[in-house]
Swiss-Prot record:
This is Small ribosomal subunit protein uS7. PROSITE patterns: RIBOSOMAL_S7. GO terms for biological process: translation. The keyword RNA-binding applies. It holds the Pfam family Ribosomal_S7. Gene3D superfamilies: Ribosomal protein S7 domain (1.10.455.10). It comes from Nostoc punctiforme (strain ATCC 29133 / PCC 73102). Signal peptide: none annotated. CDD domains: uS7_Chloroplast. Keywords: Ribonucleoprotein, Ribosomal protein, RNA-binding, rRNA-binding, tRNA-binding. InterPro entries: Ribosomal_uS7, Ribosomal_uS7_bac/org-type, Ribosomal_uS7_CS, Ribosomal_uS7_dom, Ribosomal_uS7_dom_sf. GO terms for cellular component: small ribosomal subunit. GO terms for molecular function: rRNA binding; structural constituent of ribosome; tRNA binding. The gene is rpsG. Part of the 30S ribosomal subunit. Contacts proteins S9 and S11.
Amino acid sequence: MSRRGVIQRRPVPSDSVYNSRLVSMIIRRIMRHGKKSLAARIVYEALKTIEERTGNGALETFERAVRNATPLVEVKARRVGGATYQVPMEVRSERGTTLALRWLVQYSRSRPGRTMASKLANELMDAANETGNAIRKREETHRMAEANKAFAHYRY
């Protein structure tokens, strides 16, 4: 058994504008090459666009988008006697949120459009309305878990 201690996860500080951990997390996810101020500008611009287009609170729409894109189950590869099985596992809330943000940013980047802020705004609005590629990815993940339900007893 390992003698190393368990690493404590550092809490993510809230962002200064919306005072939200989720906004801070998506800023970090969008950031490339250490350019955090650019990432923050993109996120705040996207949230401003959402507020202008929907009329609702931008933070509320963003939180709904993340909640809709969060998976409940996923499959993990487990090797048993020479065969690799896709074993369905429940997703912890922290990992679910991380996956949702990762998918939202990934599919925002792959969208057609001019600016990253507009692409992110469109993806977030789609996710809030239960459409979009991030939601499709969550549904696909759930389908994979459902299809491999027979291997659930290999859970570890």
